Amino acid sequence: APEKPEGEAPDGQGAPDGAGQTEEITLDDIKEGDVVAITLDDDGNAATITVQSMDMGGGQGGPGGQASGVDSYDTVNEYSSDETVSDTSLESTGTDENAALISNGAEVTFSNDAISRTSSDSQGGDNSSFYGVGAAVLATDGTAYVKDSTVTTDSKGGAGLFAYGDGTVYVADTDITTQQDTSGGIHAAGGGKLYAWDLNVETNGESSAAIRSDRGGGTMVVDGGTYTSNGVGSPAVYCTADIAVNNAELTANGSEAVCIEGLNSLRLYNSNLTGNMSDDDQNDTTWTVILYQSMSGDSEVGNSTFQMDGGTITSKNGGLFYTTNTECTIALKDVDITYNDDSEFFLQCTGNNNQRGWGQSGANGSDCNFTADSQDMKGNVIWDSISDLDFYMINGSTLEGAFVNDESNAGNGGDGYCNVVIDKDSTWTVTGDSTITSLSNAGTITDADGKTVSIVGTDGTTYVEGDSDYTITVGSYQDSADTSASTTVDDWSNYEVERPESL
């Protein structure tokens, strides 16, 4: 379902359109592929079983892109053969209809057009999120080229530009504004492809990321432009696809900056990223970037990837990186980070007790490979025993913080670990007592006063005798660093797409 780790968007995390829609079912009604959340009592028995993803009339399909789709689309203008549409206005005012639909393999160029979509009766919801129902411009089988145009929507489910299935959208030098819920700026789902250059995108509703993807994923490449989301539960980028962004301004004024779910990837290059998520009692914490698995069925379970090379991150509330109930790879290289005064962590890699059911409590940690390359960092790294964290510092990276083992969301615990590897050019400035499973240090470890920090084994062995007030407790220690399993940030050239001559 739409991007709502904060849980305030109207569709509900992983719920069908109209989150209040419920019905009593039996075990016979649950089929393979349905997603269920099970709440256990103190004895480990199932207390409640809630089906989070099955067809109950709201357009909800199976997990991982196996949804049934829609039979047909209502549209004002359908283009099934090659055409150029220029210097004109395309308007849609009907319920859940498109202003322009590209089908039958057509190639359609929109040049200097004003495209609008306004409806007070549209429903939005999953059919809009997954299939593009109600989007201003939708390509399902064919290619849309959009340039020097304006796209505005004021209806639920009113995405600006949507690529679905065999549809591809190329867009440049265009302004996109959406007003209502479930209305992303540019959107790909079901394997669609969308390529954008120098756009100005603003969204104002809930579940309305400026750069948005959903069930079935796809490919999105963004080069230049400004992307702003203002609604709650509306990150600048909601990622259930493979997305690469270069030289862009990405701002979420009412949400986390980035949400990545499941087997998907986001790579940012020389971009400026800002998040401002509000605190919410449903959540265990507050974050700026989240990598997780919601169990809604909207993304295939697997390794989430976040890479950022250059640019800036500004966190206006909460901690920085939060990962839970997933596997993930995070790599930062030379990113300038601005922290808020109340930041609780730099990285939290733990299980969760989130009220929306992100995995089974006590068994929903994160397996995270984190690499800092030429990267300055501040804040604590929080981990627990149901998570696996490999934390690499290479090429002159610095960390001012502590490694904190926090079992609050680990249930009965597990055999997870936190392994820290520091190369010869990197420095850890310790700000509090720390607990690490394995420490491999070829670099420098001191406190803020330059004092040596004691490193003591859990068996009582003193590896380093220090004069600092702080102690690092380790399961094992070595004064060398093998960084071969660290992550190398990919080059933008691997994802850059040549701008078509028609744009």
Residue ranges and their predicted role:
Residues 1-34, 42, 48-71, 295-297, ...:
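Disordered, low-complexity segments in secreted/periplasmic proteins that are enriched in proline
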Residues 65-68, 81-96, 111-132, 142-157, ...:
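Beta-strand-rich solenoid/repeat architectures in extracellular/passenger domains
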Residues 71-78, 98-104, 123, 133-140, ...:
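Glycine-rich beta-solenoid repeat tracts in large extracellular/virion proteins
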Residues 60-66, 293-318, 322-433, 442-503:
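Extracellular/surface-exposed low-complexity segments
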